[in-house]
């Protein structure tokens, strides 16, 4: 027919398949983030001084590092559990609580840290350029991971959360 435009859809796959791929990618990215963050804290707990301008760590910072290492292990486990088949053994509310908790804590820490660094510093500092955005990235990854998990759960059925249809 003249004047009719047809749009050919080359994607025969279900749209949920793409979102599930994003879920898996985000889960592994969050796992890598937690692993890197944990390794940094292990280095500091073992006496490393990189980032401390040559100063040694006090007792309080040592304990903070130990707590951070434990939280990194939990968050890395959570990231994998949300995208691996073995993760179905755990209640989704437990995994989602962990993911949303990481999102809020890391997001707030990164966001507030960026604002604080901007207000206190006249020049670009290591905190502003690397540390604070790294916290923010972790918060974004865990928030996205939790959202995508909810979106793709129940075999793609429409999910309602707080009366809002998420699909």
Where are the model-predicted features located?
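Juxtamembrane helix-break-helix junctions at the cytosolic face
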Residues: 16-19, 77-100, 153
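Cytosolic juxtamembrane helix at the C-terminal end of the final transmembrane segment
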Residues: 83-88, 145-166
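Hydrophobic transmembrane helix segments
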Residues: 36-64
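Membrane-helix boundary connector in multi-pass membrane proteins
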Residues: 113-127
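Core segments of alpha-helical transmembrane spans in multipass integral membrane proteins
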Residues: 38-40, 60-83, 100-104, 108, ...
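Individual transmembrane alpha-helices with interfacial aromatic-anchor signatures
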Residues: 24, 97-98, 123-139
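Cytosolic juxtamembrane helix and N-cap/initiation of the first transmembrane helix
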Residues: 2-37, 156, 167
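Hydrophobic cores of alpha-helical transmembrane segments in multi-pass inner/ER membrane proteins
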Residues: 2, 8, 67-78, 133-147
């Amino acid at each position: 027919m003249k004047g009719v435009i047809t749009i050919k859809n080359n994607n025969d796959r279900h749209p949920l398949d793409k979102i599930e791929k994003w879920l898996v990618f985000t889960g592994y990215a969050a796992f890598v983030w937690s692993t890197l963050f944990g390794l940094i804290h292990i280095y500091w707990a073992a006496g490393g001084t990189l980032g401390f301008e040559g100063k040694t760590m006090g007792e309080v910072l040592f304990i903070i590092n130990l707590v951070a290492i434990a939280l990194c292990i939990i968050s890395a486990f959570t990231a994998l559990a949300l995208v691996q088949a073995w993760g179905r053994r755990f209640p989704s509310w437990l995994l989602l609580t962990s993911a949303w908790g990481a999102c809020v804590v890391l997001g707030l820490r990164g966001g507030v840290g960026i604002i604080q660094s901007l207000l206190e510093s006249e020049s670009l500092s290591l905190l502003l350029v690397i540390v604070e955005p790294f916290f923010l990235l972790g918060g974004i990854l865990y928030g996205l991971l939790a959202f995508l998990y909810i979106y793709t759960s129940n075999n793609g059925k429409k999910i309602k959360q707080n009366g809002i249809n998420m699909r």
